[in-house]
A protein has these predicted regions:
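A conserved short coil-to-beta-strand element within the FAD-binding core of flavoproteins
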Residues: 458-470, 570-584
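Rossmann-like dinucleotide/flavin-binding elements
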Residues: 384-418, 422, 458-471, 478-551, ...
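Flavin-dependent oxidoreductase catalytic cores
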Residues: 1-393, 397, 401, 405-408, ...
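Hydrophobic, well-ordered secondary-structure elements that form the walls
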Residues: 256, 291, 314, 326, ...
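Flexible, Lys/Arg-rich cytosolic regulatory linkers and terminal tails that connect or flank
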Residues: 351, 357-369, 373, 564, ...
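Rossmann-like dinucleotide-binding cores of NAD(P)H-dependent redox enzymes
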Residues: 412-452, 520-521, 525-574
């Protein structure tokens, strides 16, 4: 293992007797992996264990772990309001410590962010009855008994964290109950808990005093807070600094975990506190660094720090004490280990796609094993069986990942790609400026295929003879799909959406875009058409724009549509397109009223997904030993698909060659099929 004495990332940090082995960490986040009893079971623990094995210094877990039953919002949240969690924490901490890493939890009361319709139907409460847009509850105002109760249960939760063998904890003041008392936007009280800054700090200080009484002086306690929420009417930089200095003065804290902006709207989440692909790298490092100069406690920070160069800069320049690469570790939990062995160039980069913040959190578009470590491997093991010859046809996401995993298994892999470049449909996604980082999904795999010795053959439209000449034991068809509009009457009059996205055709005049999927294609078309068309009508089958995407992607498209002046018309069905002189007559139906309406256009572009390119698959079926059939049970359970008793070639298809889905599905197909081949 290489020594990195000159690397600032590998300088240990000591906090109250705890030595953190390097400066890289993962912050607490709501992974959604808690079990049915809101406990950190095996699935939850394995997710964090991979990061510890990968070499980071500190993994923090349990984002929004609730201290009482009126602080719920999601089924996967952890419940630290009961002693039942202690054995789980003990097991958890032992496994993380065995890998040389430290472990801490976040405890909180959500206040107005609690969702009253979740499980127990208790009303949300807050310092004042000020509604939050994001979680939508109208909270009741807390009375003195509520305040005393929350102070007490926060202390009890902290005691459980210590009994569980954890190294420390953080409270969540950023947008949660403590922060709601701190902020003038949410605290409208006129008693001793509201008004001036000292009063607004009172509740938070009471909480931390109680925590310190419960855990003693040796246990590490920090607070997560925003350094500037002024855009939402909250505390600005100067007042936030005063808050931090007040808490420092009282001596209850050992570190600050600092963020920027608000969390009360999708826009604030996607552009401020958890910035995605549309935001530049590490947008808040400079203001966080300025804040750090005015406090004395160690400072942690996470916000789109996705590359090692930026992380090194943050530590070297004294902007941070611990650099949190949370989403970067979702993409690759082995970041530190790869640096240590000289493989920094092989780190799988986070592209900021925000899939990990969606309903399937913490899954990663780039890394299908994340969040599924209990069943699917982060590290592909080399096969103990004789090497096989595997042919992959198609160099899109599914084909690239299938080739990579098969090569990791030690097999001889040949990949055929019909075009002059790898990437498939992903190459079109990078054509929109704010999504250009998607190119990293292609580039990383290209590099891995080169390292692993995959024989990549471009500009070859593989036919059956092309494949069979290779005498493979396994053939994987990953030929993707092409736009399919066959169900629309007059589909032949519609313009191919890919021709527009690739700029092979520039629509002008009156343009209608029909978005029948709720994915990226429709809005991407709008970006390409806007400015060239004399008029643009955007119709969609869904009630909201980009419905199939995560909130972090939806809000960016909505912002861009607002800036372009595009007003999408929802719940519409495109029925037919007919020629009418030099124009097109377009017939639509409102799903709300059933009313048929007709308009005219010069160009109609419809996105209704893709249909599989499966001609080659059909031709090879009869020559395969499995008739091209995938054993679904084996596929789901991760078992080997191959019947070693049968001679000849086994044939499979994955990704859009099977069905029109997304990149994450294509990657997962490849993992499930190939990791046991």
């Amino acid at each position: 293992m290489k020594k990195h004495r000159s690397d600032p990332l590998f300088e240990p940090l000591i906090i109250k007797g705890l030595t953190l082995r390097n400066r890289i960490m993962s912050t607490s986040h709501a992974s959604g992996l808690g079990d049915e009893n809101h406990m950190p079971g095996e699935t939850y623990q394995r997710y964090h264990l991979e990061k510890a094995r990968g070499g980071l210094a500190l993994t923090m877990f349990g984002g929004s772990s609730y201290v009482s039953e009126d602080s719920l919002w999601a089924s996967g949240q952890l419940n630290i309001s009961t002693d039942l969690i202690i054995p789980h924490l003990q097991q958890f901490s032992e496994s993380i410590h065995a890998e040389g890493a430290a472990i801490m939890i976040q405890i909180t009361h959500l206040g107005r962010r609690a969702e009253p319709n979740t499980q127990n139907w208790l009303p949300a409460m807050a310092p004042s009855s000020v509604r939050e847009i994001g979680h939508r509850a109208i909270p009741r105002e807390m009375d003195q008994q509520d305040i005393q109760r929350v102070v007490k249960v926060m202390g009890e939760a902290a005691y459980r964290a210590k009994e569980g063998g954890l190294d420390g904890l953080e409270t969540m003041a950023h947008g949660h109950l403590i922060g709601q008392f701190l902020s003038p936007a949410t605290n409208k009280r006129s008693d001793e808990y509201g008004g001036n800054l000292e009063n607004r700090c009172r509740f938070g200080l009471m909480v931390h005093e109680e925590i310190r009484q419960q855990v003693g002086d040796d246990f590490i306690v920090g607070m997560r807070m925003s350094i500037d929420e002024s855009a939402g009417g909250g505390s600005d930089f100067e007042e936030s600094l005063q808050i931090a200095q007040i808490f420092e003065r009282e001596g209850f804290l050992d570190f600050f975990n600092l963020n920027y902006g608000g969390i009360d709207t999708e826009r604030a989440l996607a552009t401020q506190s958890m910035p995605g692909m549309s935001v530049p790298s590490a947008p808040w490092l400079e203001p966080i660094g300025a804040f750090k100069q005015e406090v004395h406690l160690p400072v942690f920070h996470a916000a789109k720090i996705a590359d090692i160069a930026t992380a090194r800069h943050a530590i070297h320049e004294g902007l941070l004490d611990m650099v949190a690469m949370t989403r970067a570790h979702i993409a690759d939990p082995n970041i530190v280990a790869k640096i240590q062995r000289g493989d920094e160039h092989r780190i799988r980069p986070c592209v900021g796609a925000s899939v990990c913040m969606g309903e399937q959190r913490p899954t990663c578009m780039h890394n299908p094993a994340t969040g599924r470590e209990r069943y699917w491997p982060q590290k592909i093991k080399r096969s103990n069986e004789p090497q096989k010859k595997i042919v992959v046809v198609g160099g899109g996401p599914a084909g690239l990942e299938a080739a990579r995993i098969s090569a990791e298994r030690g097999h001889e892999v040949v990949l055929f790609e019909a075009s002059s470049a790898l990437g498939g449909q992903l190459r079109m996604a990078t054509g929109v400026e704010w999504r250009k980082d998607m190119q990293s999904l292609i580039d990383w795999r290209k590099n891995e295929l080169a390292v692993l010795g995959v024989n990549v053959r471009l500009n070859i439209l593989a036919e059956a003879d092309t494949v069979l000449t290779e005498t493979p034991q396994v053939v994987i068809i990953a030929t993707g799909g092409v736009p399919g509009t066959g169900w629309i009457e007059g589909a032949e009059l519609c313009t191919d959406p890919w021709d527009v996205i690739t700029k092979a055709f520039k629509p002008t005049g009156r343009v209608i875009i029909f978005d029948g999927t709720g994915r990226h294609v429709g809005p991407t078309l709008a970006e390409h058409v806007h400015g060239n068309a004399s008029s643009l009508t955007y119709l969609m089958v869904d009630d909201i724009l980009s419905k199939e995407l995560t909130y972090g992607e939806r809000i960016i498209w909505r912002q861009r549509f607002a800036k372009m002046g595009i007003h999408p018309k929802g719940e519409q069905t495109l029925k037919s397109v007919k020629a009418n002189g030099n124009a097109l007559e377009v017939t639509c139906v409102s799903e709300l009223t059933g009313k048929i309406w007709i308009t005219t256009a010069d160009v109609v572009i419809a996105d209704t997904g893709t249909v599989p390119v499966d001609d080659l698959y059909r031709k090879l079926q009869q020559t395969s030993n499995n008739n091209g059939i995938t054993d679904v049970s084996a596929f789901l359970s991760g078992k080997n698909q191959l019947d070693m008793g049968k001679p000849g070639m086994s044939l499979f298809r994955i990704g859009d060659a099977l069905s029109s889905r997304n990149v994450a599905a294509a990657m997962f197909d490849a993992l499930r099929l190939c990791h046991r081949l």
